[in-house]
Amino acid sequence: MKITVIGAGSWGTALALHFSQHGNRVSLWTRNADQVRQMQEARENKRGLPGFSFPETLEVCADLADALKDSGLVLIVTSVAGLRSSAELLKQYGAGHLPVLAACKGFEQDTGLLTFQVLKEVLPDNKKIGVLSGPSFAQELAKQLPCAVVLASENQEWVEELVPQLNTSVMRLYGSTDVIGVAVGGAVKNVMAIATGLSDGLEYGLNARAALVTRGLAEITRLASAMGAQPKTMMGLAGIGDLILTCTGALSRNRRVGLGLAEGKELHQVLVEIGHVSEGVSTIEEVFNTACKYQIDMPITQTLLQLIRKEMTPQQVVERLMERSARFE
């Protein structure tokens, strides 16, 4: 199958590498013309995922039309902020009918829409829209270390058709029609990872980390259920699986944001040092707004938002959470 990958960050590049190494032709495209030239010349993404050479089956395209030609699937792996404009480009290039998966995680700022909802809004006639989510770090996938993820769409027939096509010896895919649950799990776990990074940075220990992960899962489940998701989805790869990885893994950008804030650094400084997008930061406010809309209590999210707004110190965030009224779990 020919697969088009839009977005050449670390995750987009890792997916392009992976699928091109497992029987697919892949075209990789990004808006950044300088990055395209660099990748074409070096046959490697030295900016986004250095150290991994591109196979012959991976083509880096300067022209999106070339990248979309004969494509059977489009993966949009931009930041959530770039998702809508990428979907609009598909329409512009006459490719709005192609099957498309959002492989980014978060809520769109200002609209509060989940990734698949953005795609449905831009491409209302497309019946093959979904998300790819789950516990997966780009570096590990590029090294061909095993992982398992979830492909979710409201179109069950398409999921049943696509999952076997994309399954490999390295990446095992599970299908789901609970696209809301899969998308919410992927989005909100980034917020919880900042909280656990904060706790770890303050050296509050493993007990505190376990408490934050567990109560974070409770927050995610409450919100997802209110939005129409199946609670059991949060017990799977797209829920607790992704949450554990992002909250504990050394490669987690969002956890590193929390670690940096615990050191007393300004948020902008932390983001510059990380050098990549942290979807958790841009998601916090939209998650809180959505929780308010559905009247869902999300204390971890709320206190983190106050931290980002400089209304609290890192220490006060943890103190506030510990001082909450006693209740049954």
Swiss-Prot record:
List of catalytic residues: 189 (proton acceptor)
A single MF term (Gene Ontology): glycerol-3-phosphate dehydrogenase [NAD(P)+] activity
UniProt entry keywords in alphabetical sequence: Cytoplasm, Lipid biosynthesis, Lipid metabolism, NAD, NADP, Nucleotide-binding, Oxidoreductase, Phospholipid biosynthesis, Phospholipid metabolism
Localization: Cytoplasm
Binding-site residues for NADPH, renumbered to this chain: 10-11, 31, 105, 138, 253, 277, 279
The organism's place on the tree of life at top rank: Bacteria
Pathway the protein contributes to: Membrane lipid metabolism; glycerophospholipid metabolism
GO process annotations (BP): carbohydrate metabolic process; glycerol-3-phosphate biosynthetic process; glycerol-3-phosphate catabolic process; glycerophospholipid metabolic process; phospholipid biosynthetic process
Pfam short name (any one): NAD_Gly3P_dh_N
Annotated EC: 1.1.1.94
This protein's GO CC annotations: cytosol
InterPro entries documented for this protein: 6-PGluconate_DH-like_C_sf, 6PGD_dom2, G3P_DH_NAD-dep, G3P_DH_NAD-dep_C, G3P_DH_NAD-dep_N, NAD(P)-bd_dom_sf
Residues that coordinate or bind sn-glycerol 3-phosphate: 105, 134, 136, 189, 242, 252-254
Family designation: Belongs to the NAD-dependent glycerol-3-phosphate dehydrogenase family.
Biological function: Catalyzes the reduction of the glycolytic intermediate dihydroxyacetone phosphate (DHAP) to sn-glycerol 3-phosphate (G3P), the key precursor for phospholipid synthesis.
The protein's name: Glycerol-3-phosphate dehydrogenase [NAD(P)+]
Biological classification of the source: Bacteria, Pseudomonadati, Pseudomonadota, Betaproteobacteria, Neisseriales
